[in-house]
Amino acid sequence: MLAAPALALQARAQDAKPIVQQAVTAELAANRDDQSHWRYLRSEAGGNSLIIVETEHGAISRHVQENGRPASAKALAEDDAHIQKFIHDPAMQQKQRQNGEHDDKSAVELMNLLPQAFLWSVVSETPEMTTLSFKPDPNFHPPDMEARVMGEMSGTLIVDRAQHRIRTMKGRLESDVTIGFGLLARIKQGSTFDVERRQVAPGYWEITETHVHISGHALFFKTIGQQEDEVKSDFTLVPLGTTLDQAVGLLKGAAK
């Protein structure tokens, strides 16, 4: 009688990994084909909020609120000056583009590692979504430090069943991660992340919430403290071919 539950759990674990792989495949295909750009509101902890407008030439932003109050004329003037500098400085545009490409490359690499980095199991299923849990796989050999930190996490993944897209991924670092015997860096146990994604238009999924709380030290006790809490909302598709000058109009129009 005891063998039946054990076999059921084993089958459940075996069923989980293909679900994760299918979600990863769907995400990578969507990312590869997605040429969309968006205007949206980014709200940060502390009461700051900004309108962001993306274009193929780069993204620009302008404050709406500071510390929970309407942005001051001084802050808006500083934003406008920075926008004009960005519009007329190809080097700034290139740097932003390179940073974005680097982040995208890292995200793709980590996404590819998801199925093999963890031990997966199905927690629950509804007609709309599947909830899975993950924990470190002792047989996983991370190729770099980012993967090493990721591989020490345990947490939850929620997948949309209709489109096989990732809705939620949240995790907690189960043990300290040290680099150079702890002299170069130590990321502390208990560090957490939570990323929420939703369909913002038919077939388009975007990150709508990010919560990252990481602590530790690096390079002989320099403190690591990444604390990020932001919500993105009010997504509107930006027309293809929109120039940066046209994006300024979209930016200011959204703030009215």
Cite the ranges covered by each PLM segment.
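M16 family metallopeptidases and their MPP-like homologs
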Residues: 209-211
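Structured extracytoplasmic
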Residues: 12-154, 162-167, 172-190, 196-199, ...
